[in-house]
Amino acid sequence: EGDLALTGAELDALTDKELDDKVSRISVYARVSPENKIRIVEAWQRKGNIVSMTGDGVNDAPALKKADIGVAMGITGTEVSKDAASMILSDDNFATIIKAVANGRNVYRNIKNAILFLLSGNTAGILSVLYTSIMGLAVPFAPVHLLFINLLTDSLPALAIGMEPADAELLNEKPRDPKTGIMTKDFVVTMLSEGILIAIAAMSAYHIGIATSAA
């Protein structure tokens, strides 16, 4: 892969099907027009890839708009390219893109973990109330208890989870499918498992408390 070079004129002579077959082998493009750049972006997208396009000129704007992630130069880039892009490199340093990807992945992971923590705790509360209702026992939580749990014992740890720094292996992970939401099958299974375990621990303490007070 990456052993071919193509000029704009040669690209014009290719059909979309021919370009799709060759695009993964082309590493250098020369004298390409804005239309050529759009075709290159579309060819990679048809292969199921998430495409990022960098540019700084007016002629780059259409492809920047077409790409999944258009990246414009903040210092040397034109206003047209900046308006078309979804991300602007304020220092014109391509290494910053890698840092941005790492930060984005870390933010997404932290949000997901914080949501998982909150939903697991709420699941445990629901299961505990359901258990005591079915068993004919006194409700384990008063409204003020639930308010305290949601405002303090859940919110503060969730904020801490949301501020976790990125680890060194974050960029080694495979990119996630952009069509996949947060509530995946694994997420739901983990949420229910943790919620059940917390509910069991809470109800065990509840029964111990009842037995102790009755003794």
Language-model features, listed with the residues they occupy:
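Basic, alpha-helical nucleic-acid-binding regions used in initiation and control of genome expression
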Residues: 64
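Conserved Rossmann-like nucleotide-cofactor binding loop
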Residues: 59
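Membrane-embedded transport module
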Residues: 2-53, 67, 72-215
